[in-house]
Amino acid sequence: VTNERDGRDGGDRRDGRAQRDGRATRRGRPGYDKESLLRVAVKVFNERGYDGTSMDELSKRLGISKSAIYYHVAGKDELLQLAVDRALDGLFAASDEAAAVEGRAIDRLERLVRASVAVLVAEQPFVTLLLRVRGNTAVEKQALARRREFDRLVSGLVAEAEADGDIRPDIDPAITARLLFGLVNSLIEWYRPRRGGAGADEIADALCKVAFDGLRTRPAE
C-alpha cells in the first residue's frame, strides 16, 4: 500500500512510529483503543471498500489525528490484516471443533456448519470484510490462500461423508461444499441481530434442515 493511497504524510508516519516505539507499554489514549479503532475501520472498509478508504477518511470518522491512529497500528494494511485474521481464526477454530466430534464425517460436517454460523453471527462485520477481499494486496492474497485452505477442509469432509454413504454421490464434493457454505455465507447479506430475533442456534437449525435434508441419502424403498 503506497503512502498516496493511505493519504499518509511523512510527519504523521514518523510521529506514529515514534509513539509506538517509545511508548510500547503505554495503554491507548482515553476515548479509543486498538479494538474500537479496528471496529470503526472494518465498518468503513465494508462501506467504502478497502481500496476506497484512506487514512484521512478513517481519521475523520474516528475524530482523531492520523498520528493518533499510527500510535496503534502501522497503517490501514495492518487493520485489514487484524480484521481478516479474526474472521479466519474463528472459522479454523470451528473446523478444529468439528474435527473433535466423534462419529461419522457427516456429523463433523454438520458441527462445522453450526460452528461457522456462530462465527458469522458473532463476527459479522469481520467475516463480511473477509468475503469481499479480492486479492489486490499482499494481505488480501494471504487471506484468500487461507480461505482456500478452509474450503479444502470442507470439501474433504463432504467427500468423506459421501464415501461413508451418508451424502448423495451424484454431486461433486467441491460443488456441495461451495453450495453448503454459500448458504452459510449468505448470512452477511441479510442477518441483522435484533432483540427477540433469531439467534445463532436457531439459524443453524434452519440452515442444517434445509441443507442436510437435501444432501442425505435416502433409504431404498
Language-model features: locations:
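Hydrophobic alpha-helical bundle segments that form small-molecule/ligand-binding pockets
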Residues: 100-103, 148-176, 191-194, 215-218
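Amphipathic C-terminal alpha-helical segment
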Residues: 119-122, 129-132, 156, 160, ...
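Base-recognition residues in the alpha-helical recognition helix of bacterial helix-turn-helix
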Residues: 46, 70-72, 82, 86
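Hydrophobic alpha-helical connector segments
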Residues: 82, 93-122, 173, 177-180
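Amphipathic, non-transmembrane alpha-helical scaffold segments
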Residues: 38, 80, 84, 88, ...
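Short hydrophobic/aromatic patch on the recognition helix
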Residues: 63-73
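Basic, helix-initiating cap at the start of DNA-binding domains
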Residues: 1-48, 52-64, 77-81
